[in-house]
């Protein structure tokens, strides 16, 4: 049996109900702003940074089950210097986002009067008499697709919202002292309406989700989400 059993109190993080009642899970447009991913994934990024801060401030280690040791969580303050981490600890995401969204918004096309010498931009002449659909079709034909983003902070991994949300809750429930069997019951209640997502239904799958969530806390704390 693994030698470490860690149940420590979290200060800032609490279990959350999933939010999938709209197209916000997949839509990259949020309140008129263009994002690299859906707003719900930025919400999860925020919550996992908060978890990292929680672990750091409360000396909650992540268990390395391969090497039988504890890993101290330390959030990269230099990387997250513009996030205002004291607010991440206490603010609701929606309030924080209002002030910080400029860090995550993608550059949008604009009308220009002067051309800048910048290789990051295309300058395209468009006949104003064309229909919008024809303009879009023409631009798509001219510009090669790219996987890069223009925002200052970008999501690097193709996370899925509900599985990430489940990992988040499992980690918190575990540190609230719930057993794996109790967590299975909690999952069945919180995610009972989401038939398209695979919900952990036995203790071994709870363990795998917990370890995956712990790895995500470590990578997020380093600046990779």
Residue ranges and their predicted role:
Residues 149-225:
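K/R-rich mixed-charge low-complexity regions
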Residues 2-150:
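DNA-contacting interfaces and partner/effector-binding or oligomerization modules
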